[in-house]
Amino acid sequence: KGGVDLYYEAAVAGAIPILRPLRESLVGDHIQRVMGIVNGTTNFILTKMDESGAAFGDALAEAQALGFAEADPTADVEGFDAAAKAAILAGLAFHSRVTDSDVYREGITKITATDVAVAKSLDLVVKLLAIAELTNEGKISVRVHPTLISRSHPLASVRESFNAVFVESEAAGAMMFYGRGAGGAPTA
């Protein structure tokens, strides 16, 4: 209304203080990529599928029973929540106005226990990643989708309802912000 932006750290990645570093600490650096696990519900589900071979529906039911997932989990499992967070991260990282409609979005509902098992056999893990990066043409690409990542990548170690944001910049290099991402207290 008044042409001002409001910043709430819990709006992206729960208890992780990521908005202020992007807006203030790294403002003089040239960020090349921001990618992260920004939805604790989907990370919990994918972790259960990876660790115990659970089916998607069973892992979702457990997330709901523990209070990590809403009764209607559509916003989480279809990637809408992560897309909104990706837009916020991209806007701050690249000093641009980015909206949810600018974000390619794909959720995790089509991921099967077999998909996760095959990934595991290849020393990979499935994560729903929000990715914002500058293309070679200098444009901003923002997307949310299930991604296969090496188990040696720092994001692969993010389990259960935890979130993490991995930032790659020209001066600072690679850094990861990590913390609780779902549930009442982390998102309050």
Give a label for each model feature.
Residues G36-N39, H145, E168:
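Short beta-strand segments
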Residues I31, M35, T74, V118, ...:
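Short, flexible coil/turn micro-motifs enriched in small/turn-prone residues
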Residues S152-A188:
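ATP-dependent carboxylate/acyl-activation modules
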Residues Y7, R33, I45, K127-L128, ...:
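Structured core elements
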Residues M49, D58-S157, F162-A164:
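Substrate-binding/catalytic subdomain of NAD(P)-dependent oxidoreductase enzymes
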Residues G2-A69, D76, F80-D81, I88:
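Rossmann-like NAD(P)H-binding beta-loop-alpha module
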Residues V12, L134, L148-S150, G173, ...:
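Residues that cap or initiate secondary-structure elements
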Residues G2-V4, G28-R33, K139-I140, F162-N163, ...:
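Short coil/turn connectors at secondary-structure junctions
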